[in-house]
Swiss-Prot record:
Disulfide bonds join C34-C59, C42-C63, C46-C58, C52-C67. PANTHER family: ELAFIN, WHEY ACDIC PROTEIN WAP. This is Omwaprin-c. It comes from Oxyuranus microlepidotus. Residues 1-24 form the signal peptide. SMART domains: WAP. It comes from the Eukaryota. The lineage of its organism: Eukaryota, Metazoa, Chordata, Craniata, Vertebrata. Belongs to the venom waprin family. Keywords: Antibiotic, Antimicrobial, Disulfide bond, Secreted, Signal. Expressed by the venom gland.
């Protein structure tokens, strides 16, 4: 397969992974809690946990939605 074909396939797989399931069911949240609210201007960095890389969560702090490393409480 040519490198152009591989890039196209990778792009399509990436888009497919970001699409919400057609059934309308939300994916489960990732484990852990969001750390305390950061002191910074409003920013919308993510829509849900799955729009964040790795184990990061999409944390909502009022007008701020950003990807953050989770904290775990025993």
């Amino acid at each position: 397969m040519s490198s152009g074909g591989l890039l196209l396939l990778l792009g399509l797989l990436t888009l497919w992974a970001e699409v919400t399931p057609i059934s309308g069911q939300d994916r489960p949240k990732k484990p852990g809690l969001c750390p305390p609210r950061p002191q910074k201007p409003c920013v919308k960095e993510c829509k849900n946990d799955w729009s964040c890389p790795g184990q990061q969560k999409c944390c909502n702090y009022g007008c701020i939605d950003e990807c953050r490393d989770p904290i775990f409480v025993n």
